[in-house]
Amino acid sequence: MSIAALFTWMITILGGLILLVIWIIEYDREFQSAAATRLPVPVISAHALLAMGGLLFWIAYLLLDEERLAWAAVAILGTVAVLGLIMAARWIRVYRSFAAPGPSLTRSTTVPPERNFPLPVVVAHGILAITTLVLVLFTALGAGGS
């Protein structure tokens, strides 16, 4: 189960990196202002950095078999999940409001960069994140062995 958690964590980070690259490209290309995005830059940064840092704790746990490293990874991953939920809630509002062009959308309307996220990537990232959290938590609790 611990190796499965490692793989799901790495795939989840890969999906997150895809979303981050899309966001950076779109943000840099057209918007140049913090008001253009609905996702707080500190939340995006903390989410990404903590996810990678937590993965390092998980790898250290796998190598050293120290239970406290597993619990540190659980705590970090829990924080990452909360930040992810904050971003998901904000992204859903953007996705819905810009899904179908209506009378409120004109050529001058600024579309946030996160509107360009591919829906399948966002959904897969979320499902993998939940799966990773469950696997990491169950492994830390001792279910399924190492």
Language model segments and positions:
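N-terminal signal-anchor/start-transfer transmembrane helix
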Residues: 5-30
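Juxtamembrane boundary at the C-terminal end of a transmembrane helix
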Residues: 132-146
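Short alpha-helical packing/oligomerization segments
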Residues: 63-95
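Cytosolic, membrane-interface loops and tails of multi-pass inner-membrane proteins
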Residues: 26-39, 97-113
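Membrane-helix exit/interface motif
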Residues: 22-29, 53-67, 87-90
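Core segments of alpha-helical transmembrane spans in multipass integral membrane proteins
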Residues: 40-59, 75-85
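Individual transmembrane alpha-helices with interfacial aromatic-anchor signatures
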Residues: 111-128
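Transmembrane alpha-helix entry/boundary detector in multi-pass membrane proteins
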Residues: 1-8, 33-49, 69-73
